[in-house]
Amino acid sequence: PHTPTSCIVGSSDVYKRQLHDFGTRSTNEIEKDLLKFSKERKMELILPCLYSELEGSALPNIVEEISKTKYLDHIIVGLDRANEAQAKKAWKFFKKLKSPFSILWNDGPALKKLDKELKKKDLAPNELGKGRNVWYCLGMSIARDTARSVALHDCDIKTYDRRMLAKLFYPVVNPLFNFEFCKGYYPRVANNKMNGRVARLLVFPLLTALEKTIGRSDYIAVSYTHLTLPTKQDV
């Protein structure tokens, strides 16, 4: 599959369900709804990335796909591991986006100063990485105080298309739904094994259910070997 197969949504009572993509609605139809919803429910996208990803094969396509959307109010790019010259190049790179955007330069003097002040109050993240990047991006989103819904996703998804973004927003933006969060998932294959949420939340439970229903079989046993099995905490 080239797009997320499903998403998990939840509401305030911690009830969760999986919404599978059966392809019954086109991307254009979903985006048409989102554009209508955006008039009263502004949407903001967070893109945490490394500068090196600008030179990879995934992010240029992601930017191109996002540039085709019309429902986003604002985009926050969290830029990590970039010097001043690279930050300027990043600004030119993300100008391809059609929506208004801001770049949070995490290695810049302003962010370093803020990080230092927050550390004195024991409020800053202790470890460098994507978590810290997202933490500051969310802080910027809260400070802007314009978005009704915020989505974020990685910048290394090689099979990305704009349907993924539309499906992330749709369950939480649609006023007829009561969902407060949504997680998309899609196959991640490495070392001849399927990884990620699609293995943990879809394939593994499916194989377990089949095993309980029809009993042990060589086919199911072999299928397990092609998964990165979840830990007890994941299950």
Segments predicted by a language model, with ranges:
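Active-site-proximal specificity loops/subdomain of glycosyltransferases
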Residues: 95-144
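Short, small-residue-biased leader/transition segments that mark boundaries at the very start
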Residues: 1-15, 228-231
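N-proximal low-complexity "stem/linker" segments adjacent to membrane-targeting elements
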Residues: 12, 16-64
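Short beta-strand-to-loop element that shapes/binds the nucleotide-sugar donor at the catalytic cleft/hinge
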Residues: 180-196
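Short beta-strand-to-loop acidic/aromatic patch adjacent to the donor-nucleotide binding site
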Residues: 147-156
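Conserved donor-nucleotide/metal-binding helix-loop-beta segment in metal-dependent transferases, i.e.
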Residues: 162-181
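A conserved acidic beta->alpha catalytic loop
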Residues: 79-90, 99, 108-110
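Short loop->beta transition adjacent to catalytic acidic/histidine clusters or analogous donor-positioning motifs
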Residues: 42-43, 67-77, 100-101
